[in-house]
Amino acid sequence: MENKFPKNVRQIGNVSDSPKIYVEDYVDTFFLQLSEKSEKEKQPEGAFLIGEMQKQDNEEYIYIYGAIKIKELKKEGGEYLINDKIWKCGCEECSQYFEEGEIIGWFVTEHDLQLAPGSINVKLHKKLFPKKNTVLVMKDSTNQEDVFFVHKLGDLIEIGGHYTYYEKNPCMQNYMIASRKKNGAVQTENVEDTAAQSFRSLVRE
């Protein structure tokens, strides 16, 4: 993103917290697809988040411009199970679709999800993402409510709000088309048109 702030931006919630989180609209659309699939099948779904972190004028920013589906995400005793095989697969797909991308967190969604990670998943996050300001997004597929958490101060701290932004994003668009074919995600005739129309309608509200 080369230290350029997105132009087409929509604020969601209270964004006074730090770091500031920006989520590209294709990614937000993909979250919705996974959430709808999770609600329909009553199984957890998840994704690794692709993005970058920046610092400007003493303020920290996180840009999430991609997401890779976590293969066969399972949950046992309240803990999400992400083994070495799943992690390796995520890294390989990140390299395939987002050549210079970095995995900076994860997203989970399921039916009637309690929007708090719990100590067992905080521990998992620290193992997978020890870096400061890595992100966990939790989305209840029942009511579509979501909460963002950031790894700082030795814990996962809830962030009160974030921004969504829209820009040309061929890498995520191509991944979504491929994912739709492989994983049976919600069908759309044109991923680009759907994301653009969704964002424009939200901005008008």
Model-derived features: where do they sit?
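N-terminal beta-strand/alpha-helix entry module and adjacent surface
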Residues: 1-105, 111-195, 205
